[in-house]
Regions:
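N-terminal capping/lid subdomain adjacent to the active-site entrance of alpha/beta enzymes
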Residues: 2-242, 247-256, 260-264
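Flexible C-terminal active-site loop/helix
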Residues: 2-14, 33, 329, 333-334, ...
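Short glycine/serine/threonine/alanine-rich loop segments
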Residues: 73, 127, 292, 343, ...
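Catalytic core of soluble alpha/beta enzymes
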Residues: 215-351
Length: 365
């Protein structure tokens, strides 16, 4: 079995042009990765990523170098046999923990390292990641997860029982391997796009077969958002799902006013309406705008915060992201939490590497 011989990092950035990627808060983004490269003694290389908007990617790479040192010389099967314990030891690094804990630069570095471990493991077994995960027993899956700080709501035995309960009907869901799963076009309505460009993009998305799309909102004057959302609704008709994404732009009073005004266009969800750590604000907003669900996740950094959101009924769409959480391992913990409560899971795709194509297949089946 392959043994990790070296750990390298790469600071990858790509500038976006002409308003692409813009939202109400992030006005001039690049797309970037803090990349982990795990080179094995048999020539295989595991690649992991954590997503950024460019600036600061070098900080993640430096944290990867420090956290990754302990993985050199580890055999991949032995490493992954109890990866939950491995991840906890990395997250509790006595020097770097103070910079988090479980959030920020060090947590993004852990995401990149974890994703590289899973990639190397899948390559060593000669299967894609979705197949790797589906081939594991519930007990093997739960050994990949650090359950610390979740014990009062989700024990390992409860997680195993929940996973076993889905196996009886698994064959009914495997049809998705033939048909594929539905997606939505997130590039239709970037915040800095003109009205004309948004309408043209929306119609083109429908012509391409999309039945759902996203529009960026979050203007200081919500009349601007209402006008644009109704414009898109008119362009694509009532049968197309339109999701609205404010990217954390509003304080709670403004979020309530804006979301109530936007309800008339029948959004499929309203995403990141306010500060991403503010569970009580999301709880209040979810009550006020029901039955329209509140979607959060791309900036929810760890399983404990997800526990709080789910306990409070503050989220209607779980958009867990394995490049924001501590990689696939912590993402699995959030998936099981979401299944327990239960709340609908729509993984966030904060990556150009498309890890989530694998994770969506796994979570659906």
């Amino acid at each position: 079995m392959p043994t990790i011989q070296s750990i390298k990092t790469h600071d990858f950035r790509r500038k976006l042009m002409d308003g692409a990627g813009s939202d109400a808060v992030h006005t001039d983004p690049s797309y970037g990765y803090g990349v982990t490269l795990l080179k094995a003694d048999n020539g295989l290389e595991g690649t992991g990523i954590a997503y950024t908007l460019g600036a600061g990617t070098n900080l993640i790479c430096e944290a990867i170098r420090i956290l990754g040192e302990s993985l050199e010389g580890r055999e991949i099967e032995e490493l992954m046999a109890d990866f939950g314990a491995v991840q906890r030891s990395l997250a509790e690094h006595p020097g770097l923990r103070w910079l988090g804990p479980h959030k920020g630069v060090t947590h993004l570095a852990l995401a990149s390292i974890t994703n590289a471990c899973f990639d190397l493991w899948a390559k060593s077994r000669e299967v894609p990641i979705w197949k790797l995960l589906l081939n594991l027993s519930p007990e093997e899956l739960t050994r990949l997860i650090d359950f610390s700080y979740l014990e009062e709501v989700l024990t390992i035995s409860e997680a195993n029982e929940l996973l076993h309960s889905y196996q009886a009907t698994r064959s009914e869901r495997e049809e998705v391997l033939k048909t594929g799963y539905p997606g939505y076009d997130t590039s239709v309505g970037w915040f800095q796009y003109s009205d004309e460009k948004i309408c043209n993009n929306a119609r083109a998305a429908v012509d391409a077969g999309f039945t759902a799309m996203k529009l960026k909102v979050g203007a200081k004057d919500h009349k601007h958002d209402v006008r644009r959302s109704l414009m898109v609704r008119e362009a694509v008709g009532d049968d197309v799902r339109i999701m609205l994404d404010a990217n954390q732009a509003w304080p709670l009073p403004q979020a309530i006013d804006a979301c109530l005004a936007l309800k008339d266009m029948n959004p499929f969800w309203i995403e990141e309406p306010t500060q991403p750590d503010d569970v009580s604000a999301h709880q209040k907003l979810a009550e006020v705008i029901a039955p329209v669900p509140v979607a959060v996740g791309e900036a929810v950094s760890n399983r404990v915060l997800w526990k709080n959101f789910l306990q409070a009924g503050a989220v209607g769409i779980v958009q867990a992201d394995c490049t924001r959480l501590a990689g696939i391992s912590e993402w699995l913990a959030v998936v099981i939490l979401a299944r327990k409560y239960p709340v609908r899971l729509v993984p966030h795709v904060g990556d150009m590497g498309q890890i989530h194509q694998h994770l969506v297949l796994f979570s659906h089946i």
